Structure formats: C-alpha cells, structure tokens
Amino acid sequence: MNGLNRESSNSDDGDLKDLREHVEGSPIIGLDTIENTRCSKFAWLVSLTAAVGGFLFGYDTGIISAILVYLGNDLGKTLNGSEKELVTSITSGGAFIGAIVAGLCADRYGRKMGIYTGCILFIIGAIIQVASYSIAQMTVGRAVVGLGVGSAAMIVPPKLHRQNIVDSGYLSITTGQLVSYGIGAAFASVSQGWRYMAVVGAVPAIILCCLLPFCPESPRQLVYHNKRDEAAIVISRIFPDANDLQVQQKLQHISIHVETNRNLNTSLWWQIKQLHVVGANFRAMFAACGLMAISQLGGFNSILYYSGTIFAAVGFDKPIAVGTIIAATNWIFTWINLFLVDRVGRRQILLNTLWLMAAAMSCAAICFHWIPISPSLEIISQQTGWAADGVLASMVVFVAFYSIGAGNIAWMSSEFYPIEVRAVGTMLLAMSCWGSNVIVSSTFLTQMENITPSGAFGFYAAISFFGWIGVYFCYPEVKGMTLEDIREVFEQGFGVGFAHEKQKELKASTHTSDARDMNQV
C-alpha cells in the first residue's frame, strides 16, 4: 500500500494543495447560507422536473418484471431463461454505457441537452418495444431504453437546492417502480398487454420534454461557460428571499469550484490515475464503489427484475399483483430512510440492516427448499402452502432493510471523493452500479436453474453478510464533515476509528454552541 500514497510529482503536490486549501478551506463555503432561505415555486418546478426524470428511471427498470411474465409467444416463441436474461440485462448494459457518456459530456454540453437526449432515447426505446415481434427487436428496444436510464441516473437531478431535489430523486425512482407494477397488474389480463406496459414509459418522457423549456441550465453550467450574470439571475429566481450578498456568495462558491477544476486542468486519465495511485483517493473509491457493488449484487435487482417470474414459479396466481407488495415496501421504506439517515448516520444504519438482509435471504433460501420447482423453474405441485408465503415474507423483509440502508445510502457515497477527482469518481460509482446490475440480471435465472433457487438466494445472503463485514472495517461515518475532514479520514487508512472520534468532536462542538446560544437568550 505504500506505493498508493505517493503523488506523481512534487510540483503537482504543491499546486494541488494550494487549490485544495482554496476550495475546502474557503470562508465562502461557511457563509453559503442561501440554501437556508425559502425556495420559490420556480425551484419546485426544477424539483418536479428532476422527479419526472427519476420516475422514468424507476418505471423502466421495474416494468420488465411484468413484461417477462406476459410476453408469452408474442415474439415468435416462448422465451427461455437465457433469452429472458438477455432482454433484461441489456438494459443495464445500455445504462452502463449511457452513464459513461452522460458523465463525460455533462459539463461540455450541459444538463438540459443530456436530459433531452435521455428523453428521446426513452421514447424511441418504448416505440421499438411496442413494435417488436422478435427477440432481436425487443433486445434493441431495451438497449436503447438502457442508454436513457444511464443518462437519467447521471444527470438528474441537478444540484440546486440539495435536500429537496435529492429526496425527490430517491422517492421518484421508487414511485416509478411502484407505478410500473401497478400498470403491469392492470394490463395483466389484456391481450398483448405488455405492449401497453412498454408504451406507458414514453409518457413521462414526453412530459419531461414539455417541462424542460421552463427550466434553466444549472448555475454551475452557466458559470462554466462564463455566463455569470445569467447564473446570478437563476440563483435569484430559485431563492427569491436571498439578498444580493447571499446570491454573490453562492455564485462565488460555484465559481471557486469551477475555476479549481479548470486550473487543475485534470484530464480523464489524470483523474483515473489519481484515484488509483493516491492512497486516500483509492480508499475512498473502494469504500464508495464497494458499497454500491454490494447493494446491487446482494439480490435486490433479481427481485426487482424477476419478481413476477419468481412468484409465478412458487405458485401465486397473480404474480405481478403480488410483486406490487415488494414495490410498495421499497417505496414506504425509502421514506423511512430519508427520515433516519441524517439522524442516525449512514454507517450505523448499514451495520443494522446488512446482516438483516442476509438473514432474510437465508430464510427465503430455506423456504425455497420446501417448494417443488423443476429445473426449468416450473412448479411441480400447487400445494406450496406456507413455503410460498415464507418466500414472499422474506423478500418483503429483505427489501425493507435494503431500502432503509444500502439501496439509498450507496448513492450518497460520492461525497467521499475530493473535488479534483469527484467527477470521475461519481462516474465510476454509477459504473459500479450498472456493471454489478448486468452481472445479476444476466445470471439470476441461470443460477436458479443450475444451483437451485435455495442455492441462488443463499449466495445472495452470503454477499450481504460479506458486505456487512466490509462496512464494519472500511466504511467511515462522515455525517456533518467538511470536504477537508473527509479527506483527512481517508488519509488515516479507511479511517473508521478516526471518523468516530471526529463525530464525537462534532457532537461536543454542537452541544457547546447550543449551550452558548441558550445562555445568550
């Protein structure tokens, strides 16, 4: 590990250190109080636009579960397990590519252009799916949708009023997944109803295209292209109660970060190198991308994509309606996550949920042992009784703890990265998501056939358990810390103990400040 702690050159060290101090130690950041002021209706329009983008993301990742159940032989034949995996995983593969392209192009061409492109891809993909009469056509349609999903994941939402928009992003994704299951259940008895399920995905994309003309480009993007006056106008429209000083402070805060990136002149390969040769950066990347991989490889996406297939295999008459319970659980417990995460802390939530996810998957594996399923995943006897109910209950418990913990927290880890490598670090985080997603979606049914359902779910239980071990040793709590503090944490190894002491100091400082305020009153 010693080699990881050496910078590429002393001169680079000096320049980089000066710029870090300028950004991370800037008093402007401490005076950036504008976000404590009231947001305008205009800001909520921006938030709504972001929510529609998240809804698109959620709907198109959720609807495949129903489509797989009701495709029948409409594509010229009944799909086998490998063909179902292809149709499903190709979307994640497209999202992997879309996330890379969107991440690299966002600064140069702006967020709005990226969102427009994503919407067009959603619409084209939906049309291709609706018109599909072969597996090849359906695969192309799902791949095009995947490109749109990856774009949406990278560029929606913009970082304007952070908490409201980020919260709406998480909730809109799970809302899209819940609605997709509802639409699937509604068209379950309609002839070729899966085509209607697919075309509904184009509706929010059209709505988003109609909303975008009323939304400005992000202030950061405007500053990036030397349009400071326009950026100030946008900030004033978002925060109407802010005074001129607060607007200028916000503008200067954004300008510092933009100019830092320009002065560093950091190429893609330079950032990738810094993430791998600088020890603190590498550990931050390992912790962030590792949690993301665990969140995807632990089995949630096998449930999201294949719940209809699973519940049909264990004997439920209306598998998509039953799957709606899973989507509703995900939606409800995402709310709980948003309530708890800043109060309890991410590390504590992860430590309390990952082992319970493993326990729930283990229970599902045990229940599957008592359900007679053929190697082709067809139920042999309808007398499944308690075991089928046990599978459903175990999955509900798993999804509940997943949504409270790793499912949402994994996306929050981008703040581990220092400013000079955050752009590429965040892109790698998204790539970890979609790369792991491809692995799960392209192997789940094969696992079920080759090592039995019990073996597949036991495997996912083991991944969640090893994830718990990884969090215990490698995932520090950075709640309330500055960028400089977070950098210091990862300079102390993975800094779990160091971060714990920092949290004690922050808590003591907060109590002292509160007591001083009370005495003044």
Residue ranges and their predicted role:
Residues M1-F239, E259-V521:
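Alpha-helical transmembrane bundle of multi-pass membrane proteins
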